[in-house]
Amino acid sequence: VQSKAIIIALSKKTSTITFRIDEKYERGLRKEAEEKRISLNTLANQIFGDHVELDQYMKKFGMVEMSKGSFRELLNSLDEKNIINFAKSIGSKEPKDFILFKWKELSPQSISDFIKMYFEHCGYGMCDMETDDSVSTVSVHHEFGNKGSIFLKAFLEAIIQSTLEKEGDVKMTENSVTLKF
């Protein structure tokens, strides 16, 4: 699997482009690249990739980002019933609209791509995906405790119900949620 990823990465076409940027931005980018132990070119490619693949869609769609601490506080202020209702409400509307906006179709692949992108970009947790035959499995590890798992379970169930019109099989622990669909 790793050699396949390397071959795909090496087969991507690249192009050369030149930009003029403010010196303070250059210093900031060089510092960040050094801290991440990557080249300035790699960092720039990541920034451009994030913009093209995600940020422009998030902005056009009106997404609002929230810190992990604020999200944790929100969850802690709600009882279990309200957490489930909140998660189902947002999980059954915005994801479907966003997926259609970005990918133009509702398919297991576009749903999986959305979940991975959304969870990792929005800070809900680290996401691992597998697909065997016709079953996709999404595992999310997070830092929000039991109330976070309750929210994420209801959120993921609502996404699958509203997009694929089927039930997902969801398992949860205090800091992880696994969904099969």
Please give the residue ranges for each predicted region.
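Surface-exposed, Lys/Arg-rich phosphate-binding patches that contact polyanionic backbones
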Residues: 9, 23-46
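Short Lys/Arg-rich basic patches
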Residues: 1-23, 34
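Short, basic amphipathic alpha-helical segments that act as recognition/interaction helices
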Residues: 38-61
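Short, low-complexity, charged/polar intrinsically disordered tails
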Residues: 1-7, 59-66
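Short, hydrophobic/π-rich interface segment
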Residues: 119-173
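C-terminal edge-of-domain segments
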Residues: 172-181
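Amphipathic alpha-helical core segments of compact helical bundles
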Residues: 26, 45, 49, 53, ...
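An N-terminal amphipathic alpha-helical segment
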Residues: 69-137
